[in-house]
């Protein structure tokens, strides 16, 4: 219902939901939804507990989480089929800021990585059906900022990011890593992007993970993909209509929610 960037998105196999973001001149608390099978504009769903950009989204078939609300450690949730305002779910633990984080999920577990803290490599997780705080899952394969993620029901893929020893974004990375969602542990090398970049928009179905746009540091329009079950480098998929970054993405079968 509004133009914004740094929105948190997720959904079920019928609805996509999007919360927060920055429409300018200030952050938003609006939650919108779309029906994935039907083209059309987003419709108002409700509101987050506070306005904020850089909110991360994850979901099961019935419940959607918004992590890092108002750039804090707050986690909100909604029931996807029931319009209304978000309710408190718990907190992001381990002293992590919620700002500029990224999330993904299987049908049962959500995964969260804080993309703001310099030197952070900690991955957090929780159970979508059970309210409460996150717990430590493991470490990413390097201390990167703005490293996004997507998943099927088995594996989560992390891609890109940048190293920021001096606060600049000059050291863009081309790393792709993965974790097995059901088993806590550190991320393992998967392959490489064709272009080193950060702020990538990512989504997946059971087979394929898409990685679109990003900054290198200029904004890009490329779309790449990997086959989630097979480690290897990203391959060309196509192009966005315009160069984009800092958006969000979902699908009707992300996180293993569908059978594609």
Model-derived features: positions:
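Polar, enzyme-active/binding microenvironments
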Residues: 1-260
């Amino acid at each position: 219902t509004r133009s914004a960037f740094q929105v948190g998105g997720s959904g079920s196999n019928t609805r996509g939901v999007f919360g927060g973001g920055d429409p300018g001149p200030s952050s938003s608390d609006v939650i919108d939804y779309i029906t994935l099978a039907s083209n059309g504009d987003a419709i108002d769903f409700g509101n987050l507990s506070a306005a904020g950009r850089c909110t991360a989204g994850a979901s099961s078939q019935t419940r959607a989480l918004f992590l890092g609300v108002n750039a804090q450690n707050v986690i909100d949730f909604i029931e996807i089929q029931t319009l209304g305002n978000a309710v408190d779910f718990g907190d992001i633990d381990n002293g992590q800021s919620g700002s500029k984080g990224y999330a993904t999920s299987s049908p049962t577990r959500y995964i969260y990585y804080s993309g703001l803290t310099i030197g952070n490599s900690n991955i957090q997780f929780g159970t979508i059906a059970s309210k409460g705080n996150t717990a430590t899952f493991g470490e990413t394969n390097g201390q990167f900022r703005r490293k996004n993620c997507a998943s099927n029901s088995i594996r989560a893929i992390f891609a890109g990011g940048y190293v920021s020893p001096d606060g600049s974004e000059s050291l863009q990375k081309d790393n792709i890593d993965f974790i097995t969602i059901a088993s806590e542990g550190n991320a393992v090398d998967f392959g490489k992007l064709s272009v080193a970049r950060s702020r990538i928009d990512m989504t997946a179905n059971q087979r394929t993970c898409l990685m679109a746009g990003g900054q290198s540091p200029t904004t890009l329009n490329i779309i790449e993909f990997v086959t989630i079950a097979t480690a290897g480098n990203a391959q060309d998929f196509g192009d966005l209509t315009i160069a984009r970054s800092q958006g969000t993405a979902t699908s009707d079968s992300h996180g293993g929610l569908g059978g594609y």
